[in-house]
């Protein structure tokens, strides 16, 4: 795919955005009242639902840890989530690696020492995939954990960025992901510390830092929206206490 199919002479992308524009980001918390925690993320056409269960007794006893909780992550990708056959049938190995990355990331963020010999289960349902799925899974997990009342050290906020020739792009859609070098970056909302980064395909070292900084800037935008959603969801509870 040529440069001009990704970014026109007028500086517009195939979905009408400029290089530094994000897609519309919306999030809802507590949409499944019967669950311990839940959150729904929409980033453009990408849609992810997260359900959190626990802390509870570990399903597999051997995974119980004497000094902290064990975080189990499962990702389910709906068969109708994308029209791209290659993406629809992505390998189980890739999904397992994504689950492991999410587990490692959130075991560092959750105050796991408060729940020894227990398990927190995170179930992610990718309902529609139009790019930035891993980022959306991370953002949805953060909100669902907060909704479940599980203590976390900070928000984990995530976004993507890529490069076409020497032009950087923020928040790639599915078409852009299939054609460009890009990365996913997650940071702690308050201190902007990078806690997760995944590079997809090769990228020239001269551009890596700039692309990473763009993804971090996108994560800051995500953080502000997520903070507002949490405050909004907490209003009824706070009102009942007054």
Swiss-Prot record:
InterPro entries: ExoRNase_PH_dom1, ExoRNase_PH_dom2, ExoRNase_PH_dom2_sf, PNPase/RNase_PH_dom_sf, Ribosomal_Su5_D2-typ_SF, RNase_PH
One CC-aspect GO term: cytosol
Superkingdom per UniProt: Eukaryota
Compartments (UniProt record): Cytoplasm; Nucleus, Nucleolus
Coarse class of the protein's main subcellular location: cytoplasm
Gene Ontology annotations of biological process type: exonucleolytic trimming to generate mature 3'-end of 5.8S rRNA from tricistronic rRNA transcript (SSU-rRNA, 5.8S rRNA, LSU-rRNA); nonfunctional rRNA decay; nuclear mRNA surveillance; nuclear mRNA surveillance of mRNA 3'-end processing; nuclear polyadenylation-dependent mRNA catabolic process; nuclear polyadenylation-dependent rRNA catabolic process; nuclear RNA surveillance; nuclear-transcribed mRNA catabolic process, 3'-5' exonucleolytic nonsense-mediated decay
Keyword field: Cytoplasm, Exosome, Nucleus, RNA-binding, rRNA processing
A Pfam family that the UniProt record links to this protein: RNase_PH_C
Gene Ontology molecular-function annotations: RNA binding
Subunit architecture: Component of the RNA exosome complex. Specifically part of the catalytically inactive RNA exosome core complex (Exo-9) which may associate with the catalytic subunits rrp6 and dis3 in cytoplasmic- and nuclear-specific RNA exosome complex forms. Exo-9 is formed by a hexameric base ring of RNase PH domain-containing subunits and a cap ring consisting of csl4, rrp4 and rrp40.
Similarity comment text for this entry: Belongs to the RNase PH family.
Protein's job: Non-catalytic component of the RNA exosome complex which has 3'->5' exoribonuclease activity and participates in a multitude of cellular RNA processing and degradation events. In the nucleus, the RNA exosome complex is involved in proper maturation of stable RNA species such as rRNA, snRNA and snoRNA, in the elimination of RNA processing by-products and non-coding 'pervasive' transcripts, such as antisense RNA species and cryptic unstable transcripts (CUTs), and of mRNAs with processing defects, thereby limiting or excluding their export to the cytoplasm.
Protein name: Exosome complex component ski6
Organism ancestry: Eukaryota, Fungi, Dikarya, Ascomycota, Taphrinomycotina
Gene transcribed to yield this protein: ski6
């Amino acid at each position: 795919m040529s440069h001009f199919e990704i970014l026109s002479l007028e500086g517009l992308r195939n979905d009408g955005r400029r290089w530094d524009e994000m897609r519309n980001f919306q999030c809802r918390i507590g949409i499944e009242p019967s669950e311990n925690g839940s959150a729904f993320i929409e980033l453009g056409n990408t849609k992810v639902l997260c359900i959190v269960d626990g802390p509870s007794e570990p399903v597999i006893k051997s995974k119980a840890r004497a000094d902290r909780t064990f975080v189990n992550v499962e990702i389910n990708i709906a068969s109708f989530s994308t029209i791209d056959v290659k993406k629809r049938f992505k390998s189980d190995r890739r999904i397992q690696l994504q689950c492991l990355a999410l587990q490692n990331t959130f075991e560092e963020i959750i105050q796991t020492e408060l729940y020894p010999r227990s398990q927190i289960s995170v179930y992610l349902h990718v309902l529609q995939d139009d790019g930035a799925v891993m980022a959306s899974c991370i953002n949805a997990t953060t909100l669902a954990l907060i909704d479940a009342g599980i203590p976390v050290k900070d928000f984990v906020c995530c976004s993507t960025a890529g490069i076409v020739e020497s032009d950087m792009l923020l928040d790639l859609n599915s078409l852009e992901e299939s054609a460009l070098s890009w990365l996913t970056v997650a940071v702690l909302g308050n201190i902007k510390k990078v806690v997760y980064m995944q590079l997809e395909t090769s990228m020239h070292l001269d551009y890596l830092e700039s692309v990473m900084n763009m993804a971090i800037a996108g994560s800051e935008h995500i953080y502000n929206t997520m903070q507002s959603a949490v405050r909004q969801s907490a209003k009824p509870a706070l009102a009942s206490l007054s």
